[in-house]
UniProtKB/Swiss-Prot annotation:
It comes from Treponema pallidum (strain Nichols). GO terms for biological process: protein transport. The chain crosses the membrane at residues 25-45. The SecYEG-SecDF-YajC-YidC holo-translocon (HTL) protein secretase/insertase is a supercomplex required for protein secretion, insertion of proteins into membranes, and assembly of membrane protein complexes. While the SecYEG complex is essential for assembly of a number of proteins and complexes, the SecDF-YajC-YidC subcomplex facilitates these functions. This is Sec translocon accessory complex subunit YajC. Belongs to the YajC family. It is found in: Cell inner membrane. Pfam families: YajC. Residues 108-135 are annotated as: Disordered. Keywords: Cell inner membrane, Cell membrane, Membrane, Protein transport, Translocation, Transmembrane, Transmembrane helix, Transport. It is a single-pass membrane protein.
């Protein structure tokens, strides 16, 4: 019989388990914790910040704000209700949409409007592309 095998037979099971698990130490749990922290910082935290910003934006919508819905419909808020908004999309058409359907407010986000940008800079000649956008 092999001498190592005879020693294993004489060792109590508890000692054998302690020998095999004692080599792991604290490094693997620490590594898992670091990976979880990095995952939280790069995935969950930015998403939570974006949700808070969007909720604040939707909460502060007022009459006259130019908005864009998640479906891409552009309009101006004409009536503000508790859970919905009525937006005017043209001279004759209005839509009632849920507050959660608003993707952005054009004024507050700094989205430029080519027509007003061109009008606000007198003396600057329009290029061919600018003329197409300004129409």
């Amino acid at each position: 019989m092999c001498p190592a095998r005879s020693r294993m037979k004489t060792m109590p099971h508890r000692t054998l388990l302690q020998i095999t698990t004692a080599n792991g130490g604290w490094i693997p749990p620490l590594a898992i914790g670091v990976v979880c922290l990095i995952f939280y910082l790069f995935v969950f935290a930015p998403n939570l910040r974006e949700q808070k910003r969007t909720q604040a934006l939707i909460k502060n919508i007022k009459k006259g704000d130019p908005v864009v819905t998640i479906g891409g419909i552009h309009g101006v808020v004409s009536v503000v209700r508790e859970h919905s908004l009525v937006i005017k999309v043209n001279e004759h058409g209005t839509l009632e949409v849920s507050r959660s359907a608003i993707a952005r407010i054009n004024d507050r986000r700094g989205v430029s409007n080519p027509k007003t940008d061109c009008d606000s800079k007198p003396g600057v000649p329009l290029t061919g592309v600018d003329k197409e956008i300004a129409r």
